[in-house]
Amino acid sequence: MSDTSLDSMRDLRAASCGPVGSPEVTTDLSENVILTSLDDLHNWARLSSLWPLLYGTACCFIEFAALIGSRFDFDRFGLVPRSSPRQADLLIVAGTVTMKMAPALVRLYEQMPEPKYVIAMGACTITGGMFSADSTTAVRGVDKLIPVDLYLPGCPPRPEAIFDAVIKLRKKVGDEAIAERGKLEQTHRYSTVEHRMTAVDPIVDGRYLRAETQQKALAAAEAVSPLNLAPAEQPETIPAKS
């Protein structure tokens, strides 16, 4: 295209734009400018720099500690562990939560600035795990205390599973919108920690010892046992002379 044609196109554009004229954008600037929305820019900055607060109370936290090493290198996801809840936007709960620790966990969550996210890591965190049957102090799920964005099951989850959870959380952060964030807030955020215990019959009640097959096994064991000896005769005691 000749220079005359370019000049005529610029004159036509300037005439159609009115007295303000057409914006003059150089070629170098047009090739180095990225057009995006405020939501995409804000979400991209947050999902690339998640600062987790590590709340480890049991063995699940050992698997998360493995991510700090060079074998997995979780720094490539932009994760920067923080020791203060006021500087964190991601709370990772790993391990059993007891009734006594529940107020401290809720206090840490409330001190985190918005927007904030929670990952429940491990079976004990999600449902109480092996303590959910007869424990009087274990919380049956951390979601009874604080809202959970992502559940990570396992006993314990492997480091690769933790990476998968972080990737899924990044996708959730990337799809958020500033205008709709207020609609996503939960009305009833916390539930009570006073769990109603259900009385059940004891598991070990001795009935298996009274079974016929068990009685035969015990009798056979007593017959061949080398410890099945006659009781030793008690030595005769001679009263002392006065």
From Swiss-Prot:
Binding site for [4Fe-4S] cluster: 59-60, 124, 155
Keywords for this protein: 4Fe-4S, Iron, Iron-sulfur, Membrane, Metal-binding, NAD, NADP, Plastoquinone, Quinone, Thylakoid, Translocase, Transport
Source organism superkingdom: Bacteria
BP GO terms, sorted: aerobic respiration; electron transport coupled proton transport; photosynthesis, light reaction
Pfam families in the cross-refs: Oxidored_q6 (PF01058)
Chief location category: membrane
Necessary cofactors: [4Fe-4S] cluster
GO molecular function, one term: quinone binding
Membrane association type: Peripheral membrane protein
Positions of disulphide bridges: none
Cofactor binding, per record: Binds 1 [4Fe-4S] cluster.
Annotated catalysed reactions: a plastoquinone + NADH + (n+1) H(+)(in) = a plastoquinol + NAD(+) + n H(+)(out); a plastoquinone + NADPH + (n+1) H(+)(in) = a plastoquinol + NADP(+) + n H(+)(out)
GO cellular component annotations of the record: plasma membrane-derived thylakoid membrane; respiratory chain complex I
Location in the cell: Cellular thylakoid membrane
E.C. code: 7.1.1.-
Function recorded in the entry: NDH-1 shuttles electrons from an unknown electron donor, via FMN and iron-sulfur (Fe-S) centers, to quinones in the respiratory and/or the photosynthetic chain. The immediate electron acceptor for the enzyme in this species is believed to be plastoquinone. Couples the redox reaction to proton translocation, and thus conserves the redox energy in a proton gradient. Cyanobacterial NDH-1 also plays a role in inorganic carbon-concentration.
UniProt family annotation: Belongs to the complex I 20 kDa subunit family.
Subunit structure: NDH-1 can be composed of about 15 different subunits; different subcomplexes with different compositions have been identified which probably have different functions.
Name assigned to this protein: NAD(P)H-quinone oxidoreductase subunit K
